[in-house]
Amino acid sequence: MLDQSLLNQSRAGLSEIEAEYIASSLLRICPPVSPQQTNLDVTKLLNEHPDLISIAVVEDNKPIGLITRNIFMEGLAKPFHHDLFDRKSCIAFMDKDPLVVDQNMSIQELSFKVLGSGRKTLNDGFIIADENGDYLGLGSGEDLVKVVSFLQAEKNRLVTESINYASVIQKSFLRSSREDMSAVLQDYFMHWEPRDKVGGDYYFCKKFDDGFFLALIDCTGHGVPGAFMTLIMASFLDHILVEDNRHDPAGALAIMNKKVKMALGQINDSATDGFDIERFSTKQNGQSDDGMDTAFCWVNTQAGILTYAGAKTPLFYIGDASSDVQLLEPDRKGVGYIDTPMDYAWTNQQLPLTKGMCLYLTTDGLIDQIGGVKKIAFGKKRFSTLLHENYLKPMPEQESIVMQAYYDYQGKQKRRDDVCLMGFRF
């Protein structure tokens, strides 16, 4: 549950600018359905409105639930479910406890409510009602992010005071990825170590029937600003992988690039799907040039093939003792930045996987750390040598060896960045 004392502190610290924005600023007029309508009606409505993420279920003008496109489509996709559910009431796939907020609720309070209610609300959206509880429309987590990014400078002191709470939120976002990772991999490690209590490095894993999708993400900055960016990326990535985009990491990067540039106003095109991006963009103050370096990987476990697309983040791998550590080199453009074109196309690279092959990803916090006698960067060569010398050992032991070498190399030098490092054996 959300700590009420944090909410009270936030209310006390609201600036005049923050007080101008309320939940109705995010209102999107979206057609609802009634409990009397069938799942066939919902399917038709979703097809007519491809941008709808969710549909409210309303009875006597009061919202009673929320149907999410992802869950609805996945439910009907199961064998015989169209025959079983098409003509039944749409409440069969309804979330009976969605977040419903008053149109006059402040953005500050709304942000805490959305984060406190978990990842589901950030991804699927929330219902906005009037003072009588009557349905007005929907708000999306994506639009909320746009407002919060604009208000971030004004709220920095408050966010810093809530840093411990932010750390809990960030770790909760990572939990499902750890669970899926342990389900699909037998010998692996994942080392996540923010420079501060929260950070801009993020990892993602999601299992599917035919394989799993893996991502290592290094967002702009560290600390609170970096952590805020990871929440944006986590929400976007969940949405992107709903369709068959998981089989096309380069395509997923392209979609992510467009979403980030639009959400943060790092675009020249003012077409923003009905949302007044210029009103909320930090670009108008010349402050926003944020994005991420990342590697997206789709592992087809049935075919034994890895498809990789990288934005300034390489993939390291080694097959046997007779070979050196090899790299799949990334494209040299990051995701979402002002100098990355809206239509930039990343490249997919395929790697056949053999039993026992070891694969590794790391953010630049490890590679770029200054240390040693010469006070130079740790570097890819030193990292590759460590991998080659130890790849036959269990992955958790490799993690300990690499990280101890990193700590020893850093010595008394200042820590430069967050570190996120993962490895797995196929």
Region spans (language model):
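Short, low-complexity N-terminal regulatory "tails/caps" that precede and couple sensory modules
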Residues: 1-27, 132-149
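Bateman (tandem CBS) regulatory domains
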Residues: 17-31, 85-99
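The conserved cystathionine-beta-synthase
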Residues: 32-51, 58-59, 76, 100-123, ...
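Sensory/regulatory domains in signal-transduction proteins
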Residues: 101-147, 151-154, 192-194
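… and, occasionally, acidic/histidine-rich disordered N-termini of signaling adaptors
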Residues: 155-354, 358, 413-426
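Active-site-proximal, acidic helix/loop segment immediately C-terminal to a metal-coordinating Asp/Glu
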Residues: 225-244, 353, 357-413
